[in-house]
Amino acid sequence: MSDGEEDTTAIVCDNGSGLVKSGFAGDDAPRAVFPSIVGRPRHQGVMVGMGQKDSYVGDEAQSKRGILTLKYPIEHGIITNWDDMEKIWHHTFYNELRVAPEEHPTLLTEAPLNPKANREKMTQIMFETFNVPAMYVAIQAVLSLYASGRTTGIVLDAGDGVSHNVPIYEGYALPHAIARLDLAGRDLTDYLMKILTERGYSFVTTAEREIVRDIKEKLCYVALDFEQEMATAASSTSLEKSYELPDGQVITIGNERFRCPETLFQPSFIGMESAGIHETTYNSIMKCDIDIRKDLYANNVLSGGTTMYPGIADRMQKEITALAPSTMKIKIIAPPERKYSVWIGGSILASLSTFQQMWISKQEYDEAGPSIVHRKCF
């Protein structure tokens, strides 16, 4: 992309509960990926002239986590702390992408079934604080389907804060059949913290939680047959792996490796009364018209960081096959880049010529106010 073009290119910003993915429309991967964290010092600054800040965002907060209290402004996909969120957006535009937001149309993403007020406030901040010329809010799962090159399918988008099943037919999301599950990566991290405590390793602070998240991402996997895997783990050490903590101490984990993500299939592990992701997928398909179910079964698209566990696609295939009619053809699509497929879908959408009339312009916002977002963005 030449510099001449970059002056009006749309910005795509996928604000996840765990990671912000941002970059320019038309690129094939996000330029900036950093944790959605704002950190504030826990202690009084004593060294004068150190240039200490009262808050840190993203990677800088992550690297100084030992002296900070870390907060995530987005919980379960819903922005709960708007001041911190503004800091994150400011950091995205000015420090990561190094652009002036008033020159770029901006595409944001959100989870389906989010409160309406959440969208309006996002719209308001974009136009009033950052003065963007135009903006749009897209549903995350729909973008993932775009990225996989399909217009029909059922997406299981599981991130850090929220998971959802969205059936889409010929490009239309079917709102009555959307299933939302407030069980995602962060809950799995918390559960892993808990079961590691049973092994005698204690992780408590917000900084230590980040270590556990790293253990989860590096060592966890989904068992094809949970009971059988538990038996294997009990009778041999073949499933044990070691992990070195930042202070050099080495810990060993065994059945925790697959007990942690098993929660996705058995939410009762963390005391949730909900159905597992395989059942929510099936229920969501069953709420759709009988004529389109076949197409949905054949196009199960996984997206989001919490679908990155090895073995998850095979397990989904097995579980959904068990629930579906016996002759049904079932296909699970798990693209290797699914961690970023929401962003990639946004990049595709924002660079389509047909999309250009879909933007909410500053002028429309000034005339109608924040509620315009419900009229223009499905």
Swiss-Prot record:
It comes from the Eukaryota. InterPro entries: Actin, Actin/actin-like_CS, Actin_CS, ATPase_NBD. GO terms for molecular function: ATP binding; hydrolase activity. CDD domains: ASKHA_NBD_actin. It catalyses: ATP + H2O = ADP + phosphate + H(+). The keyword Cytoplasm applies. The keyword Acetylation does not apply. One of its GO terms (cellular component) is cytoplasm. Transmembrane segments: none annotated. Its main location: cytoplasm. It is found in: Cytoplasm, Cytoskeleton. Its EC number is 3.6.4.-. PANTHER family: ACTIN. Belongs to the actin family. This is Actin, muscle 2/4/4A.
